[in-house]
Amino acid sequence: MTEMQPAILALLAITAALGLLVLAVVTTTAFVKVSVVLFLVRNALGTQTIPPNIVLYAAALILTMFVSAPVAEQTYDRITDPRLRYQSLDDWAEAAKAGSQPLLEHLKKFTNEEQRRFFLSSTEKVWPEEMRAGVTADDFAILVPSFLISELKRAFEIGFLLYLPFIVIDLIVTTILMAMGMSMVSPTIIAVPFKLFLFVAIDGWSRLMHGLVLSYTMPGAL
C-alpha cells in the first residue's frame, strides 16, 4: 500500500491539473463566446440537435485554438527562456509570472472596464482586509470574472442580432398559415426549410466563423 501512495498522489495531481486546464480554457479564452454564439444560432434555426453538441463544441474549440495561438506561442517562448533555471521555488514563481503575462494582456484587451471596476470595488465588501490590500485591476482574480462576463455579454449581443432575421421568418410563416386557416400546422415545420435556405444562401457558417475570429483582431491590424 505504501509503495502505491506516490503513484496515487501523482495520478490525483495530474487529474487536478487537467481539471484546472479545462477550467482555464473555458474561462480565459474565446471558447465561451464562440460556443454560446454557435448554440444560439442553432436554436434560432430551429434545428434543435443539428448540428450535434459535439460538433459545435469541436468547432468552438478549434476556433479558440486558432484565436489563442499567439498567446500560447508567447507563453511558450517565455517559459522556455534559457535564463530560467527551474532550480528553486523562486525560479518557478518567476517563470509562472513571465509565462502568465501574455494571457494577462489578452484578458485586459477584451475585458470591459466597467466589469473590472465592479469586481475591484466588490473586494472591499467581499474579501477580508488582508486579501484586498494589494489587489489591483490587473490581477487575475479581477480580470478572469470580468473577462467571462464581458464575453457572455458580447455573445448574447451577437446572438440577438442573429436571431432577428429568423424571427421575421417565423412571423411571416405564422401569419400566412393563420390567413390560410392552417392554424393546426406547426409553423416550425414550415419555417425551418426557409431558415436553412437563407442561412445557406448567405454562406452563414463561413460568415459567422469569420466574424467570430475577427472579433479578436489585434489593435492596429488591417
From Swiss-Prot:
Report the subcellular localization. Cell membrane
Task: Please indicate which superkingdom the organism of origin belongs to.
Answer: Bacteria
Question: InterPro entries this protein is in?
Answer: T3SS_IM_P, T3SS_YscR-like
Q: Which GO terms describe its biological process?
A: protein secretion
- One GO cellular component term noted in the UniProt record for this chain: plasma membrane
Main location class: membrane
> Which parts pass through the membrane?
6-26, 52-72, 158-178, 182-202
Listed A to Z, the keywords are: Cell membrane, Membrane, Plasmid, Transmembrane, Transmembrane helix, Transport
**Membrane topology annotation:** Multi-pass membrane protein
Q: Which cysteines are joined by disulfide bonds?
A: none
Keyword Transmembrane helix among record annotations: yes
Family classification: Belongs to the FliP/MopC/SpaP family.
Q: What functional role does this protein have?
A: Could be involved in the secretion of an unknown factor.
Instruction: Give the PANTHER family listed for this entry.
Output: FLAGELLAR BIOSYNTHETIC PROTEIN FLIP (PTHR30587), SURFACE PRESENTATION OF ANTIGENS PROTEIN SPAP (PTHR30587:SF2)
What is the recorded name of this protein? Probable translocation protein y4yL
Q: Which organism is it from?
A: Sinorhizobium fredii (strain NBRC 101917 / NGR234)
